[in-house]
């Protein structure tokens, strides 16, 4: 293998690695949407998650009740939120 072929191979591998790492950093968003949150907060709680990948199963990382937490997503956001469902319980 010539030195120019080796250089092209190394540059290609570096680019593929950078693209893959960026995809992992951004994370894959899970299905569903975060429930409506109509709570006004004076102080935010410490985050329990940062991305959907931090949450187990189908749960999503959503800002709800003054902080980011893993919650069960809703299929679509209803006007006024889902008042009948307590989605913050594990």
Swiss-Prot record:
GO terms for cellular component: extracellular space. Its main location: secreted. Gene3D superfamilies: Elafin-like. GO terms for molecular function: serine-type endopeptidase inhibitor activity. It is found in: Secreted. SMART domains: WAP (SM00217). The keyword Secreted applies. Residues 27-74 form the WAP domain. InterPro entries: Elafin-like_sf (IPR036645), WAP_dom (IPR008197), WAP_four-disulfide_core (IPR050514). Residues 1-23 form the signal peptide. It holds the Pfam family WAP. Keywords: Antibiotic, Antimicrobial, Disulfide bond, Protease inhibitor, Secreted, Serine protease inhibitor, Signal. The keyword Zinc-finger does not apply. Disulfide bonds join 34-62, 41-66, 49-61, 55-70. GO terms for biological process: antibacterial humoral response; innate immune response. Antibacterial protein. Putative acid-stable proteinase inhibitor. This is WAP four-disulfide core domain protein 12. It comes from Pongo abelii.
């Amino acid at each position: 293998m010539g030195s120019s072929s080796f250089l092209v191979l190394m540059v290609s591998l570096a680019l593929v690695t950078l693209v893959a790492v960026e995809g992992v950093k951004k994370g894959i968003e899970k299905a569903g949407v975060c429930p409506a949150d109509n709570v006004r907060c004076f102080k935010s709680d410490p985050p329990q998650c940062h991305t959907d990948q931090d949450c187990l199963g189908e749960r999503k990382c959503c800002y709800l009740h003054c902080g980011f937490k893993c919650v069960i997503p809703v299929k679509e956001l209803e006007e006024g939120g889902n008042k009948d469902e307590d989605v913050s319980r594990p």
